[in-house]
From Swiss-Prot:
EC number(s) from the headed UniProt entry: 1.6.-.-
Protein name, entry field: NADPH-dependent oxidoreductase
Superkingdom: Bacteria
GO molecular function: oxidoreductase activity
Classification via InterPro entries: Flavin_OxRdtase_Frp, Nitroreductase, Nitroreductase-like
Organism the protein comes from: Staphylococcus aureus (strain MRSA252)
Protein function: Reduces FMN, organic nitro compounds and disulfide DTNB. Involved in maintenance of the cellular redox state and the disulfide stress response.
Length: 251
């Protein structure tokens, strides 16, 4: 049994600096086809992928994201929940389907479908020798992204992905993940607080040491401190409103 895929995904890290070398149309097509091969709930295929190589559109999205690698990459993908095609089917159906795709369950199905597709693309790209970085920052201004990409009703932007050849001086590395026993629960969830606290304390030390070594002492924060800072930041609180404006989560 080969460990090729295991070793590939274990060394994954986000790449934020790329060579100025566009992906070929053939590579883009192969990546999208790999994404389409992902599992999809009830064969709904409730997603679409928007491929972007137009420099002005990239620049407009960079203004939303605030990150230079939205422009400086080999290719940019944006992944969206897409029930527009299902809405078109609904126009000629005998049964009202909007109760389904406009529901909270419909949102979950579309988001999961898109995430599975994106991960297929990410792993395939890395197997080809490319680097990738996911871009949740496109949700900083959903209304603006919908305008830039001309998204119709029932289509919602989830995240982007920049892909390209890593720059020569790109020096990213895989970050230590939570301990195996902290994320894998056998048969039922183990919620013992003392065990959870002990495992998180150990992990905090691991992450602090990782940053200390990576930055020559310039960063030493723990994982818990990162989580407090991120989740304590009251950002993107308009998400429910934006989802509903898109025709999603109506019930």
């Amino acid at each position: 049994m080969s460990d090729h895929v295991y070793n590939l995904v274990k060394k994954h890290h986000s790449v934020r600096k790329f060579k100025n070398k566009p992906l070929s149309e053939d590579v883009v097509k192969k990546l999208v086809e790999a994404g389409q091969s992902a599992s999809t709930s009830s064969f709904l295929q409730a997603y679409s992928i928007i491929g972007i190589d137009d420099e002005q559109i990239k620049e407009n999205l960079r203004e939303v994201s605030g990150q230079p690698y939205v422009v400086e990459n080999g290719y940019l993908f944006v992944f969206v929940i897409d029930y527009y095609r299902h809405h078109l089917v609904d126009q000629h159906a005998e049964t009202d389907m909007e109760n389904a795709y406009g529901s909270t369950e419909g949102l979950l199905v579309g988001a999961i479908d898109a995430a599975l597709v994106a991960e297929n693309i990410a792993v395939t790209a890395e197997d080809m020798g490319y680097g990738i970085v996911f871009l949740g920052s496109l949700r900083n201004d959903v209304a603006r992204v919908r305008e830039i990409l001309d998204l119709p009703d029932y289509v919602f932007p989830l995240f982007g992905m920049a892909v390209g050849e890593p720059a020569e001086d790109e020096n990213g590395a895989a970050k230590p993940r939570l301990p195996f026993d902290h994320v894998f629960h056998h048969n039922k969830y183990h919620a013992d607080k003392e065990t959870q606290y002990a495992q998180m304390a150990d992990y905090d030390q691991t992450i602090s040491k990782y940053y200390d070594q990576r930055t020559n002492g310039n960063r030493k924060e723990t994982w818990s401190q990162q989580i407090e800072m991120f989740l304590g930041n009251k950002a993107r609180l308009d998400m429910l409103e934006q989802l509903q404006k898109s025709g999603l989560i109506q019930r």
